[in-house]
Structures are given as C-alpha cells and as structure tokens.
C-alpha cells in the first residue's frame, strides 16, 4: 500500500501555516522536501523565528529581506530574532527597517535577543502587539506610546533614555498582564503602574548594580491593584512604595544579607511596609536573608499573623534553624512547607528547645526538605536530619514528610534511612519518603 500524506490531504493551507508558525524557521524550511505541496508552504508562514548562528555572516540579512519581500501585503504575526550582538551592532538601521515592516503588517509577537540597537519609534504605537521581549536594546523617550493589546512584556538588560521612558512604556499598555524585568540601565527608581497587571517578576542582583557605577540601590514603586503574583530578586532596596496594591496571592522574594537593619529607621519602615503588605498572601517563598530580616524585625516589633498563608517555601542554611520556628509561629494555618537546605552544618542552637508553632499542632500536613549539600550516612549534627526529627516529633497532623538528599555512596542510603525511620512520630498517620541521589 502506498504511503499517503494524510496531513496534506486533510488540512487546508492556513492550518499548516499555523502549525509551522510554532516551529523555528530553520525547521519550517525543512518541511519543503516532504512533497510538492509542502515545497512552498513555509514561505507563506506568517512569521519568522531565526537565530543568527544558523547563518553565515550577513546571510541572515538576505534571508529576512527576501522573506519580507515575497508578499509585502501579507500579515506577519511573529518576528523572533536572536543575534550575536558583536557582529550586528552596526546593523541597527536594517533591524529597524524590519520592525517598521512587521508593525504595519499586524505583528503580535516581537522578540529581539542580543542586538544592541535602539528601537524605532514605530514600535511605540503598534496596535497589534501582544507579546514583547527585548534583550540588550535601547529605548528612547518616544513622543507618544500606545500599546493597546500588549499582554506580556520581558525587558532584559534594556537601556532607557530616562526613568520616565520605562514608566511610560508600562503605563501605556492598558491590558498588560505579565511583566518581567531583569537589569535595566539608567534607571534608579523603577515605577510599575498598571491597572491590569497580575504577575510581576524583577531580578536585579549585585553584579548588575556594579555595572551601574553611580547606582548602589534600586528604588521600587508598585501601583498595581490586581497584582496576584510577585517575584522580587533585588540586591539592594533604596525604597519601596506600594500604592493602591492589594496583597498578592503569591510572593517570592530574595534580598541580600543585612539588607534591612532594624536599627535604621528608614530600612525598618520599608520592611514594616513590605511585611504588612504580604501578610495576607496564600503562597510565600523566602530566601534565608529575608528570614533573617524578619527575625530581626520581630526583636523590635511583633510579626503580623499570616493567617491566609497555606504554602511556605524557604531557602535556608544552618543559621536559619533558630529563625524558622519564630516565623512559623506567625503562620497558624500553614498546610505545606518546603525547605531548601544549602548548608548541612548544624548550628549550635538546639531547635527542639524553640517555641512550638501553632501550625505544627493543628494544620501542617505536607513537608518536603531538599538538601543541596552532601550529607553523610549519620544523622548526627546535620541540619536536614535535625529538621526531620523536629517535625516528626512535633507535627500532630502531618501526613507526608519527604526528604530529598545527596549521598557520597549508595551504601550510605540504608544506614541513613534506618536511623531516620527510627525517629519518634507524633502523627501516627505520617508517611516518610526518602529520595536519594549520589555524588
């Protein structure tokens, strides 16, 4: 029996175009050898997804120019280009020509990776753009900005002519839902003002600030009443202002060591504002520096009750043993706890002597401990096993406790498992799961 191309027989061209649009262009071109019908299908796909490394030098320019010139009236929904910026740093005018072209042809997805150019003004008034991702580009202060359909925006290592240029780009996107910012240049205070934003992620770490010689701290202003998910990884806060913002449902925050000093009234005010703001979250992730800051705060003022918090994730080292019970005491309804242990050397403090958090007695049901450090075959003097012992001995309603760890050798697993499973359990219904990998 002859092999038949059922896809070609059953599907119309426009469906095939949509299928190929989901592929990188180099893979889309390969379909031209399938049959006579497939030979030119890729040329009518309404988009490009190209990596400069797939071309000889200057080959990319010719390919894109030919593709865009095939039918200048056809729609182009997608333009994704990844460059070696060092080779294409002089090609800014050419790239801007391509952007100008697709803006007039209904582009919805624009991705520019590693081409150090300034965006053309046409992009600021694109009525069809839905997704925008920019890496290592420059943005001037446009005369006017209107992005009425833009829903997601990713800005990575983007240079702005002024703080107002960034603020305007965000505030002029009336349906923006997802915003990701990683490294922005020439911006000292990041202002996020949006009535529709529900997910905000920002990552500005120490090495990023080091490149900005005149910048040592970042200020952050958030005015987003519908925000539901917040992920902040910021090395140094200069100030934090929260306007018209409901407490989000999910918060993930990482800061640098010693960022908030309870003796300093200014940093204390910022910390007080932030803690009050996140006290109604249901899902919270903290690094150990955040835990230290909250512990220091609790020595001056009582922590608020995190009554809605049901899931907590903490990245910790041995010094956090004394801090964890203090924070858990403010989480009376916690149901799920994840602990990432990065240092297994046991602190001199005996965690078993700490105040008993209410959640251990009435609500905590699921605990997972991840060990990223190598542990030995003995349970003595190790953070992970001390935590297991503490939780099993004090959690009255816990159902599952899982420990994921790394061992030097497979023979150590049985010894360690035997000792852990011998720990006394307050909850008779608790199941203990041990998952190990080997160095």
From Swiss-Prot:
Residues 5-60 form the F-box domain. Residues 348-405 form the FBD domain. Keywords: Leucine-rich repeat, Repeat. Gene3D superfamilies: Ribonuclease Inhibitor (3.80.10.10). LRR repeats lie at residues 99-125, 131-157, 158-183, 207-234, 263-288, 313-341. The keyword Repeat applies. This is Putative F-box/FBD/LRR-repeat protein At1g78840. It comes from Arabidopsis thaliana (Mouse-ear cress). The lineage of its organism: Eukaryota, Viridiplantae, Streptophyta, Embryophyta, Tracheophyta.
